[in-house]
Amino acid sequence: MRFDPREIGEVLEMLLFRELDIRAVTLSVNTLPAIRPNLKDTLDALSHLLEPYARRLRPAAEKVASKLGVRIVTVRLAVSPTSIMLEPLGDAKAAVEIAAFLDKLAGRHGVDMVGGFSAFVHGGVSRGAAALIESLAEALNSTERVAGFLNAASTMTGINLEAVRRAARIVLSLKPHAAARFAVTSNLPEDVPFMPGAYHGLGQPDAVVNIAVSGPGVIEAVVRSLPDADVRTLHDAIKRAAFKITRLGELVGREVAKELGVAFGAVDLSVAPSPKVGDSVAAVLEAMGLPRVGAPGSVFALALFTDAVKKGGAMAASTIGGLSGAFIPVSEDAVMAQAAAEGAITLDGLKAMAAVCNTGLDMVGIPADVGPDVVAAIIADVMALAVHLDKPLGVRLIPVPGARPGDFYDLGGLYGRVAVVDASRYSRIPLVARPGTAPPGVERLKKG
């Protein structure tokens, strides 16, 4: 990989003045060899397997960060879906113990999060998945670093409404900090570096590094420098900035993988915001010409932005992976959160934007007294978009006790301030109480 002096200078400016960083180095590890018929042997095998990786992950990332002069915000582990490990155990209490083990392992070695406490239930619920589902609320409420998801829909199988309903009940039983580590997903790829969607895919090598990038402040500066540019010029400028951001992610990923002696996987092209000033995707959209994110034109602006990021990033990475598009996590983007609190952007507006981004409804606050029918229906709406557009999407809702629309709840750190939105004027939605799985759409027929 070669860099010319001008490109190096541009990247240095981004690092020093535009909040450019690497959002996450995620080491994904195959934990299926640790499957055992009893809990004690499972935990012993997990410890033997994961300790060497966990011990070396942060030192390797810090060495690369120091060498390159790049800030790496978080280091993360991802494990094989825990539901698979629970198949011989079939016990929710065992699942809680595994979550506690992963949490302590991460804390002991300075790993910020562990993903993969998850199950794929888009076609049905297996014995291990049932145990995991039963454990999720207790496991996430009692840990700090464990993240998980339920994949409740796919283009190939449709939408499992029973899984959607169970996921809704889980969401409403989670404390706000725990809810930030849980998502309901669809069509989830195997190499996601972002939480809570990270897990070790069945088609991956035993250990692989995947990279999540950031940099909306870089793109905002570029957009603001072109106030009178035509749309094609604006698109091209965003594309070129995304290229530079992704090149940095590729370089860091290769170096960390080399330090760890594992495979380098992919760069997730998604430009992730943070609660910091000058690090907002919503601010980019407003710089493009929106009076406020959520105003008419927001879907168009986000589509233009996402397309440019994908095209620029794809040229810069040897392999693209994960979700690769644009992130609009409401609480993690200070400008987006403020717009939501003001009512400029609504739940339905966010659903519309989900059609052209890659996160779905992410980090959206809702009153904790909302009924499970409403939460299930919100999830089902996003699952329907994912299935019929054949794309990965997720739902990460934060129930806030005693809150009303327009209120904030401060989660702190990268999670930011959760803006609570109006979820629904209705309390019962009988449609989502119907049993069964909604069949896949016409997109399924195109796949043979």
From Swiss-Prot:
InterPro entries according to UniProt: UPF0210 (IPR007841)
A Pfam family of this chain: DUF711
Family membership: Belongs to the UPF0210 family.
UniProt cross-references to NCBIfam families, sorted A to Z: PRK05313.1
PANTHER family: UPF0210 PROTEIN MJ1665, UPF0210 PROTEIN SPR0218
Protein name as it appears in the record: UPF0210 protein Pars_1033
Species: Pyrobaculum arsenaticum (strain DSM 13514 / JCM 11321 / PZ6)
